[in-house]
A protein has these predicted regions:
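Short, solvent-exposed loop/turn elements at domain surfaces
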Residues: 41-46, 101, 148, 225
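Acidic, polar ligand-binding/catalytic clefts
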Residues: 56, 60, 64, 69-132, ...
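N-terminal hydrophobic or amphipathic helices and topogenic motifs
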Residues: 1-71, 242-263
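Bilobed "Venus flytrap"/periplasmic-binding protein-like clamshell domains
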Residues: 33, 37-41, 51-64, 120-170, ...
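Ligand-binding clefts/hinges and TM-proximal coupling segments of bilobed small-molecule sensing domains
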Residues: 9-15, 71-72, 145-166, 199, ...
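A ligand-binding cleft/hinge motif common to bilobed small-molecule-binding domains
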Residues: 79-82, 94-104, 149-152, 175-211
Length: 263
């Protein structure tokens, strides 16, 4: 039984070494185990095999200021709550929003606000939200704020639109490319990256759907000091422009090494 448990854990939780977290100067710092999953441009593996992305860079800067050593752990997103409860990870820091989940976790204050829009193929003729009707299918990440608000019918989109939910951003992009759906709803950062890769194929709607706040999620029973410390440094990073500069580094066409959680 112990062997089986160990094997299952290995399949759902993988520690990847990070060059920025292995310096001699920080070897004695307390470790923050951060659960992440591939979600370009927030989290991905660059050409050197190291973690990169908006959330990775924000986490590294915040942890350095807070005197914490970040350890990024690749997880199966469906196992995130179990891994938190078991202590395999300390938090989730991967394009994750407290919207609809306020009471499910112990959250930091929001550190970033994203704009959500829709992308479609240029050849489809779909240019705006008004073009979405019952004949159209839209891709969203399963469990995302986009999915929940579409299902609730509280967006300015026809309630007849077909909603197709996928397990990751990569699957949403694949569905759009293969024509399984007509469009994809996600944060503008992800959509702009798609258009930057295929500028003659896709367009992002000029009209935006909503904004979504991001936070760092700890288990709801967490009683440590990390949240308080992170709130302090993230506030300072927002005030001094650090977070804005990090986001600007990943605007479409600036960084293209990504392989591409949710909004």
């Amino acid at each position: 039984m112990l062997l089986v448990t160990a094997c299952v854990a290995a399949l759902t939780c993988t520690v990847r070494s990070s060059s920025s977290s292995s310096n001699e100067a920080d070897k004695d710092l307390p470790i923050l185990k951060i659960g992440v999953t591939d979600n370009d441009p927030f989290v991905y593996i660059d050409t050197t095999g190291d973690y990169a992305g908006i959330d990775i860079d924000i986490a590294r800067k915040a942890c350095k200021r807070a005197g914490i050593k970040p350890q990024f752990i690749d997880i199966s997103w469906n196992d995130r709550d179990r891994l938190l409860k078991n202590g395999d990870i300390d938090c989730l820091w991967c394009d994750y929003s407290p919207c609809y989940r306020e009471d499910d976790y112990y959250w930091t204050e929001p550190y970033l606000t994203l704009t959500v829009s829709v992308a479609a193929k240029k050849a489809s003729g779909i240019k705006c939200l008004a073009h979405l009707d019952g004949s159209k299918a839209i891709a969203v990440i399963a469990g995302s704020v986009s999915e929940r608000r579409l299902l609730a019918g509280d967006l300015e989109i026809s309630p007849d639109v077909q909603i197709k939910s996928y397990g990751s951003a990569e699957l949403c992009k694949a569905a759009l490319a293969k024509g399984y759906v007509d469009c994809w709803m996600a944060d503008v950062q992800s959509l702009d990256r798609l258009v930057a890769q295929y500028p003659s194929v896709y367009r992002v709607f000029a009209d935006n759907v909503m904004t979504v706040d991001l936070g760092v999620a700890f288990d709801d029973s967490y009683e440590g000091e990390y949240v308080k410390n992170l709130n302090t440094v993230l506030f300072d990073m927002d005030r001094d422009g650090t977070i804005e500069r990090i986001v600007d580094n990943y605007k479409a066409g600036v960084t293209t090494d990504g392989q591409g959680a949710e909004s």
